[in-house]
């Protein structure tokens, strides 16, 4: 898991997300606390439970982006889900326990990748030997036994010459015939919603029945080296230890991000069973509080999994969540709506900002694009004004405005190869001015 300090985490998030300092601080502290807990003695570690977070803020201000960037920084099992995808147990739809099963699958994949990297060098050595055996098969006598001859030294020298060529890549395109593991037959099983776990078990059973079979294949040496390295690495990895390590990682370092949690708040005017709202909240309770979930890899405890939830809460309020769930989300963070100044910063400051992306895209057609400061100010102001007069969709409005602004340039780029275009205030007004001023047009076009 990540050993970054809260300050380093916030600094990294600042490279991609503008503003929202409180939210960044909260997730940075929560992530660092995961590391701190793992440094404690076993007796105290089991008593320290994570402080789950509820992020509240309008759409398009960076809630989901914080989760996306956090996933890359965490270096721990991480999964993002939409609360609206689930229904109460016993009804058609996904059950909340699939969250933990998916998290465990992510942990297995992560741990497997790390284990493969550890044995990569040894696997490459063994793959190299197998390729050399295919290139220089040992001489055999009439009874099929390897011949012992005085030419062993010569053979060894030849092998070293081929080894050198192989490492230098001079034999990459040469074809050889090697024994590789035959691809496992995939068995597609159509299952009703909520029965995914049973389907996975059936698929695994059918694959195990097929067993490990070898197949002679003719392939280029560079492709054979990759296939044989993966095969040898898989042999060197202990699958049982890998599974135990992955489950431990999921239980102690796992992070679950639940988006759109405001959409499962009960509405006051509804009547009858609310299987996709309050029912889901009640099913989430034991997961967040701490329970044991059965997965195909083994039993997984959720006591120390960190849950980060977020919602716009434009119709509902955080107090509309059932009281028990509110109590399980002790840290509340409010994200602020974005201003025109924030929009300007979003267009220029983040790594791979929108303006950078369009400049790079047009460069592929040999068209130079330059955004002037007054042009960027005008784009930011246009996006902010449309948000104010119509529906406020936050930073996502910039994508719509930029697409409209760049529409003509993108279409004619192939005819403008070698030219340079300056996007200044006058150009932006000529393309967007009428749309921004006319509220009815803004509603339908921007």
UniProtKB/Swiss-Prot annotation:
<comment type="subunit">
    <text>A double ring-shaped homohexamer of HslV is capped on each side by a ring-shaped HslU homohexamer. The assembly of the HslU/HslV complex is dependent on binding of ATP.</text>
</comment>
<keyword id="KW-0963">Cytoplasm</keyword>
<dbReference type="GO" id="GO:0008233">
    <property type="term" value="F:peptidase activity"/>
</dbReference>
<dbReference type="InterPro" id="IPR050052">
    <property type="entry name" value="ATP-dep_Clp_protease_ClpX"/>
</dbReference>
<feature type="binding site">
    <location>
        <position position="259"/>
    </location>
    <ligand>
        <name>ATP</name>
    </ligand>
</feature>
<dbReference type="GO" id="GO:0005524">
    <property type="term" value="F:ATP binding"/>
</dbReference>
<keyword id="KW-0143">Chaperone</keyword>
<dbReference type="Pfam" id="PF00004">
    <property type="entry name" value="AAA"/>
</dbReference>
<comment type="function">
    <text>ATPase subunit of a proteasome-like degradation complex; this subunit has chaperone activity. The binding of ATP and its subsequent hydrolysis by HslU are essential for unfolding of protein substrates subsequently hydrolyzed by HslV. HslU recognizes the N-terminal part of its protein substrates and unfolds these before they are guided to HslV for hydrolysis.</text>
</comment>
<dbReference type="InterPro" id="IPR003593">
    <property type="entry name" value="AAA+_ATPase"/>
</dbReference>
<protein>
    <recommendedName>
        <fullName>ATP-dependent protease ATPase subunit HslU</fullName>
    </recommendedName>
</protein>
<feature type="binding site">
    <location>
        <position position="396"/>
    </location>
    <ligand>
        <name>ATP</name>
    </ligand>
</feature>
<dbReference type="GO" id="GO:0043335">
    <property type="term" value="P:protein unfolding"/>
</dbReference>
<dbReference type="InterPro" id="IPR003959">
    <property type="entry name" value="ATPase_AAA_core"/>
</dbReference>
<dbReference type="InterPro" id="IPR004491">
    <property type="entry name" value="HslU"/>
</dbReference>
<dbReference type="GO" id="GO:0051603">
    <property type="term" value="P:proteolysis involved in protein catabolic process"/>
</dbReference>
<dbReference type="GO" id="GO:0009376">
    <property type="term" value="C:HslUV protease complex"/>
</dbReference>
<feature type="binding site">
    <location>
        <position position="324"/>
    </location>
    <ligand>
        <name>ATP</name>
    </ligand>
</feature>
<dbReference type="GO" id="GO:0016887">
    <property type="term" value="F:ATP hydrolysis activity"/>
</dbReference>
<dbReference type="Pfam" id="PF07724">
    <property type="entry name" value="AAA_2"/>
</dbReference>
<feature type="binding site">
    <location>
        <begin position="60"/>
        <end position="65"/>
    </location>
    <ligand>
        <name>ATP</name>
    </ligand>
</feature>
<comment type="similarity">
    <text>Belongs to the ClpX chaperone family. HslU subfamily.</text>
</comment>
<feature type="binding site">
    <location>
        <position position="18"/>
    </location>
    <ligand>
        <name>ATP</name>
    </ligand>
</feature>
<dbReference type="InterPro" id="IPR027417">
    <property type="entry name" value="P-loop_NTPase"/>
</dbReference>
<keyword id="KW-0547">Nucleotide-binding</keyword>
<dbReference type="InterPro" id="IPR019489">
    <property type="entry name" value="Clp_ATPase_C"/>
</dbReference>
<dbReference type="GO" id="GO:0036402">
    <property type="term" value="F:proteasome-activating activity"/>
</dbReference>
<keyword id="KW-0067">ATP-binding</keyword>
């Amino acid at each position: 898991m990540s050993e970054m300090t809260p300050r380093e985490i916030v600094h990294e998030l600042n490279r991609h997300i503008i503003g929202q300092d409180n939210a960044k601080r909260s997730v940075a502290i929560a992530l660092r606390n995961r590391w701190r807990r793992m440094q404690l003695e076993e007796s105290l570690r089991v008593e320290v439970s994570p402080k789950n977070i509820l992020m509240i803020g309008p759409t398009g201000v960076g809630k989901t982006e914080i989760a996306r960037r956090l996933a890359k920084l965490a270096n721990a099992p991480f999964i993002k889900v939409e609360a609206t995808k689930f229904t109460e147990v016993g009804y058609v739809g996904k059950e909340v326990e699939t969250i933990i099963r998916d998290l465990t699958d992510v942990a297995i994949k992560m741990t497997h990748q790390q284990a493969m990297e550890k044995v990569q060098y040894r696997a490459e050595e063994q793959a190299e030997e197998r390729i050399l055996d295919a290139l220089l098969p040992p001489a055999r006598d009439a009874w099929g036994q390897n011949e012992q001859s005085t030419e062993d030294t010569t053979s060894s020298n030849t092998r070293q010459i081929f080894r050198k060529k192989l490492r230098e890549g001079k034999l990459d395109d040469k074809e050889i015939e090697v024994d590789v593991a035959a691809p496992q037959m995939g068995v597609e099983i159509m299952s009703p919603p909520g029965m995914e776990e049973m389907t996975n078990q059936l698929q695994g059973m059918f694959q195990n029945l097929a067993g490990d079979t070898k197949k002679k294949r003719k392939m280029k040496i560079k492709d054979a080296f990759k296939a044989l390295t993966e095969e040898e690495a898989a042999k060197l990895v202990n699958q049982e230890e890998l599974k135990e390590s992955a489950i431990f990682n999921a239980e102690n370092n796992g992070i679950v991000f639940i988006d759109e949690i405001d959409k499962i708040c009960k509405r006051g005017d509804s009547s009858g069973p609310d299987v996709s709202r309050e029912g889901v909240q009640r099913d989430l309770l034991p997961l967040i509080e701490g329970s044991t979930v059965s997965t195909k890899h083994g039993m997984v405890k959720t006591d120390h999994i960190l849950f980060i939830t977020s919602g716009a809460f434009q119709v509902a309020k955080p107090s509309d969540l059932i009281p028990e769930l509110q109590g399980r989300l002790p840290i509340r963070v409010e994200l602020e709506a974005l201003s025109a100044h924030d929009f300007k910063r979003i267009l220029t400051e983040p790594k791979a900002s929108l303006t950078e992306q369009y400049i790079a895209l047009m460069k592929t057609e040999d068209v130079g694009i330059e955004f002037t400061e007054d042009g960027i100010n005008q784009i930011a102001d246009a996006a902010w004004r449309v948000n104010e007069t119509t529906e406020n969709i936050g930073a996502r409005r910039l994508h719509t405005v930029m697409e409209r602004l760049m529409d003509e340039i993108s279409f004619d780029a192939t005819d403008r190869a070698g030219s340079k275009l300056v996007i200044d205030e006058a150009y932006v007004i000529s393309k967007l001015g009428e749309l921004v001023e006319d509220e009815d047009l803004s509603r339908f076009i921007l």
